[in-house]
Design a protein with these regions (language model features):
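Charged helix-capping and loop-helix junction motifs
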Residues: 13-16, 115-120, 194-195
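Short, conserved loop/helix-junction motifs that constitute active-site signature segments
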Residues: 60, 95-97, 126, 208-214
């Protein structure tokens, strides 16, 4: 269990150096980097590129498998586990087409959760011909790039992807309701900036603001 505070990253070690050192000791590397908007997934790709290059250059005898345990864009392991459960409940993947799933924002007593779960769900479920509805209050939008992927997936699979700020509309005739809390997009951007500046007091103030907003 490593983070920037426990590794040599805190002392200026590069992504390439860290990735290669860990790779000497691991067959599988899981990375979770979900709190930095616009940076988490990018960092994971930097690690993948570094390990791939290390293997090509002969530094690493073998290239470990890298697993996205959650980033700012997606939470693939959870989304796939949820999909397997849904497939089981409806008796097979062939029975998913036309089923309506409402991915809905929900209240949570904890502050500012990442956007990756709702984004992972709308990105995956739309690939199976399902009618996917993303429901949330105004200000809780997800990445527009992910919405575009969901819309394109739905078009190809014969399903649909819609957005609404009306929860009753989203839940009407839904076969599945998936409640999940996530932070306002603007707040996630602000938190990324605060973390980057090392502003611990600003982060604490933002946490209080998000709790009140929840």
């Amino acid at each position: 269990d490593l983070d920037e505070g426990k590794s040599q990253v805190a002392h200026g070690e590069t992504v390439r150096e860290t990735a290669n050192m860990i790779s000497f000791m691991a067959d599988v590397i899981g990375i979770r980097d979900d709190m930095y908007i616009g940076k988490g997934n990018k960092y994971m790709h930097e690690v993948v590129d570094a390990v791939t290059q290390g293997n090509k250059d002969g530094i690493l005898e073998q290239k470990p498998t890298l697993v996205n345990l959650q980033c700012d864009i997606d939470h693939p392991t959870q989304a796939m586990a949820d999909m397997l459960h849904i497939i089981h409940e409806f008796g097979g993947v062939e029975n998913l087409k036309g089923k309506k799933i409402a991915m809905s924002w929900a209240y949570s007593p904890s502050y500012g959760k990442p956007l990756s779960v709702p984004q992972g769900i709308i990105g995956l479920m739309t690939r199976f011909g399902m009618d996917v509805v993303l429901a949330h209050p105004e200000g809780y939008e997800v990445f527009p790039e992910v919405e575009a992927v969901a819309a394109e997936n739905a078009k190809k699979s014969g399903g649909s992807f819609t957005k609404t700020n009306n929860m009753a509309e989203a839940f009407k005739d839904a076969d599945i309701v998936y409640p999940k809390s996530w932070a306002p997009f603007a707040a996630m951007e602000k938190r990324t900036e605060l973390y980057g500046n090392g502003d611990t007091e600003g982060i604490k103030a933002l946490e209080k603001e998000l709790l009140a907003q929840n």
